[in-house]
Amino acid sequence: METSKLFLLSSSLLLVLLATRPCPSLSERCNPKDKKVLLQIKKALDNPYILASWNPNTDCCGWYCVECDLTTHRINSLTIFSGQLSGQIPDAVGDLPFLETLIFRKLSNLTGQIPPAIAKLKHLKMVRLSWTNLSGPVPAFFSELKNLTYLDLSFNNLSGPIPGSLSLLPNLGALHLDRNHLTGPIPDSFGKFAGSTPGLHLSHNQLSGKIPYSFRGFDPNVMDLSRNKLEGDLSIFFNANKSTQIVDFSRNLFQFDLSRVEFPKSLTSLDLSHNKIAGSLPEMMTSLDLQFLNVSYNRLCGKIPVGGKLQSFDYDSYFHNRCLCGAPLQSCK
């Protein structure tokens, strides 16, 4: 009897020990090479609080700001967002070879240039380096990352010209370079992207020159060139057969006759305000299902066409033109 009790007690203790002891195959999924790189990144950023969970004694697949592939257990996502973090993007980021998502966002103390080491990450699909104090040029090496579908470098201090080689990205769906200090013309190659046509966000820069003639065939879903120093004839961009929905060309120096422009039938938002556009509003605008319209602060004349959504917009959408009249403005004489 005593022997049986002793056996049961020993068995129970053994089960407790096995249950509380971590099993290496279950507790440590993270690839050791990836863990080493992540710890290097943490050290380079001076061990910020946002990365406090990056403990070398725990599985890095469970760390905050990272994700692992469910099959390979390699790090495929690094997202550092809105924390007290300072310094530069560490070169070690380029040593996470299976990374598909790279995000450093809303980090006002992140400085320096975008490191060339990122060019090694051939699996990248999404890059968001935005709302930081990154400076320097927009790197041309992004054109080597052929799997990119989303590139967001907005709200930074980037300067210099836009690399035309970005048009070589065959899968790009959206390009955000807005709210920087970029200069020079829009590359002619942007009218001929290698694959799908990305939504183009270039607003709040210091871009100058004319719209490339290649934009005659450019058909993005969204096109925002507002608040630059662009000039010339913008009418080449518009075509009734395009599928563009949102257009903002406001606060530039565009100068052309609006009278015969044929807007895309798909257009839902149009902002041409604060330019030097002359002529009259085309009658075909009454057929558009516009949700937003602003043509104020131009040199337009004539009667606002009656019909469609044109009378649903406020006075502010039309005022400060040369001699535009009709509802919602004053009656034509």
Curated annotation (Swiss-Prot):
Superkingdom of source: Eukaryota
Disulfide bond entries: 30-60, 61-68, 301-323, 325-332
Keyword hit for Secreted: yes
InterPro entries the UniProt entry points to: Leu-rich_rpt (IPR001611), LRR_dom_sf (IPR032675), LRR_N_plant-typ (IPR013210), PGIP (IPR051848)
SUPFAM superfamilies (alphabetical): L domain-like
Family: Belongs to the polygalacturonase-inhibiting protein family.
Name of the protein in its database record: Polygalacturonase inhibitor
Organism encoding this protein: Vitis vinifera
Lineage: Eukaryota, Viridiplantae, Streptophyta, Embryophyta, Tracheophyta
Gene giving rise to this polypeptide: pgip
